[in-house]
């Protein structure tokens, strides 16, 4: 995990605003939102701890890296991977794999 991703996860965990380079975290009462290059890529619901993942319109390596860093911190059994230009999300707990859809909640 990259240093910026560790700092991003720490800001989310402690519900603090954070900005470094291309990554911004905004903490609100109901959620903590993550932005990459100004595009909304994730939200953590502070009440239910549900994590909503988005690609922000960009299926870049950096977007996938940020989303995987979030998953590693908040849903460690899940991971996003790519096969033949198609993104999937897998869950090691039950061995499932499904198509990654921007806006999905885990």
Residue ranges and their predicted role:
Residues 1-106:
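Terminal leader/tail segments of proteins
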